[in-house]
Amino acid sequence: MFLLPCIVISWYVTKTPIPWYYATEIKNYLFARAHPEDGGWGLHIEGESSVFGTSLNYTVLRLVGVDADHPKMVKARATLHKLGGATHAPHWSKWWLAVMGVAHWDIVNPVPPELWLLPDWVPFAPWRWWIHIRQVYLPMSYLWSKRWQAEETDTIRSLRKELFVEDWDKIDWAAHRNTIHPRDNYHPKTWLLNMLNWILANVWTPVLRVKPLVKKAEDWAMKLIEMENENTDHLDLATVSGPMNLVALYARDGPDSYAVRRHKERSDEFLWVKDEGLLANGTNGVQCWDTAFAIQAVMDAGLTEDPRWRPMLLKALEFLDDQQIRENVKDQDKCYRQQRKGGWAFSNKDQGYAVSDCVSEALKSVIILQKTPGFPTLIDDRRIFDAIDTLLTYQNPNGSCSSYEPPRAGSWMEMLNAAEVFGRIMVEYEYPECTTAVVTALSLFHKHWPSYRSAEVERFVERAVAWIKTNQRPHGGWYGSWGICFTYATMFALESLASTGETYANSSHAKRGCDFLISKQREDGGWSEHYKVSPTPPPFYNLQPPNFQTRLTNLTPLHRPAKQANTSSTPPVLR
């Protein structure tokens, strides 16, 4: 629920017209997703109302023309005030409100672009952060340094009265830098970060921050933004950093520059309409990811040679052929990017960020089809090898795989996590889902090309599977981060073991994983898992429809009891 505000606020402050039909569907969606009891909004659609979600989505509704006296707005505003008002918002919300001029910049904890000037050997230099955080920090730091604010409007003046409990002119903005409602304080700032913020706000900024250094830092931050635009054709990594970059470029160049116009054109790719209205994706789609799994689903059903499925499968193969990333980014080392040649992105090659599991699933699908009689070889061996070369760069020292790149620093970096509403975001982490995807892709590749980098592939798989085993929880499951949650990761981990010949009959790890899933089967025969499994146990709750989790469980190597209907009470058979 925090993605749509990024786009809409960026439109408003850059004076981008919002078509009436966009405005209508945005109203429909946010009204449909308001909390049924208190009228507010949370971090996501299942979450309880928070200052973060309510302050930003209330603002969006005002920007698309909803009157402050509308009954739903009155109800939402009452909830926001009950939570303390926008002074109790987390860092990202305060930053957006400061960009609008609804809040004063003094309420925002320091975001100095000077960090980008640190030598690469510094343990906490920004290039070591997780890719999403460093891409968000770029425009955040640039605009904080400029203290840029949108042109004042009647709506902005009105929001100053609506979002805060105190009179706007009497608020001690600096005193509220660290004010946050407990509901938003998922990851409280550490003593170290609080100390650094105090030094930056009270010593560095007013006393030591000289103009030549500031200009150098701002220029380098903007150069990195420009490289991001060039490498993604102005899509940028995701729906948070992209709108922020639009505002930063608008602040520097005005409305008529190519970069600003292109950003506005491409922002539509993050939006989609469903029955409830218009909302935003976390990326510009899931095209490569979904295409790869659609191919594998047909394969698992034994239909790849069925002529009825051939037209769809051929188009899917042609799509993956077209969307393979054929080169590394320009100035790869200079802009701190991971090797990507031969890979696939989550969405498309324009966005251009290869991800370990996206590369793996697409590669498996290509191999499956191109090794099926009657399908053309659109992607030749050299391009297949390019994908393998990139996959082999993803392994971490402990054998696991992360998402976009291997970790560049340790988890201690979370001591500098300023977001407050998110944990485990400062660096890359290892994931059983990503590790499994790479293991299964390399295993399939090795069967067909046993001589290409053979020793490296075998060693990679051996170390990765060993890590999968050490990552198993005492109850037998695995914890996932890219899906909910134990069901999701256990499905992948068991697939890893199965791809190397470990089954229920011959592997204690596979047996424990299968037994774990069976122990969580519902009386109706299905499985369900609540999102609040993350981060605290117990891991399973019977609080949501079982269809999705049941499908995940049926995809695990239980000798595939997939014919069992969701309504069946017959347990799957383990052989």
Residues covered by each model-derived region:
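Preference for long, amphipathic alpha-helical scaffolds in soluble/luminal domains
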Residues: 1-575
